């Protein structure tokens, strides 16, 4: 990285940056706050680019939560076989749930601690609707947990869950820092 907000501010000054865009992942909250602090320190205008989040539709059984810890508390009331698609970080929030079985899909191998009854599936989107239907069926999943990352690459799991009548626990995005304007697509940034 840049060495925190101070390192990013130094880099902006050193390179004579006139304006910059925070196009990080919606859950890269620390980096977004560093960018906001660096922008405030250097008086360089900052714009956040965030793809739209997902929204529930008719037939969806979504449970909106503010954190992975809150998701873990809710899970035992919703199902026993969990498709966990929150990435490899943060699995410790679920580690004590020994009575549940987890299918963890991640780009990279997860770091311990994580639940004892876990099967890891290393995979990277985009995913197809047919593939997600088959995955839910084959693993007898009865609840899905995801972060609201938005975008089309990983959205088919939500459609497959709706079709199967499964509850989905959706972790809300962290807020964009105050006073940072947000746009949903690059054209709006112009």
Regions found by a protein language model. Name each.
Residues 1-3, 61-69, 181-189:
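Short acidic-hydrophobic, aromatic-tinged amphipathic segments that line or gate anion-handling sites
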């Amino acid at each position: 990285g840049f060495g925190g907000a101070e390192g990013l501010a130094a880099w902006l000054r050193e390179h004579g940056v006139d304006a910059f865009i925070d196009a990080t992942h919606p859950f890269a909250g620390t980096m977004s706050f560093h960018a906001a602090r660096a922008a405030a320190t250097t008086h360089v205008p900052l714009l956040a680019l965030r793809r739209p989040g997902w929204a529930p539709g008719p037939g969806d059984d979504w449970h909106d939560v503010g954190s992975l810890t809150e998701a873990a508390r809710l899970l035992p009331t919703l199902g026993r076989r969990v498709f966990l698609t929150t990435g490899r970080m943060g699995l410790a929030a679920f580690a004590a749930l020994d009575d549940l079985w987890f299918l963890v899909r991640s780009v990279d191998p997860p770091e311990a601690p994580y639940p004892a009854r876990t099967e890891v599936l290393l995979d990277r989107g985009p995913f197809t609707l047919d593939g997600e239907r088959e995955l839910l069926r084959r693993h007898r999943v009865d609840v899905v947990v995801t972060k609201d990352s938005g975008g089309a690459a990983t959205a088919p799991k939500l459609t497959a869950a709706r079709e199967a009548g499964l509850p989905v626990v959706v972790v809300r995005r962290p807020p964009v820092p105050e006073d940072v304007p947000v746009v949903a697509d690059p054209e709006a940034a112009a």
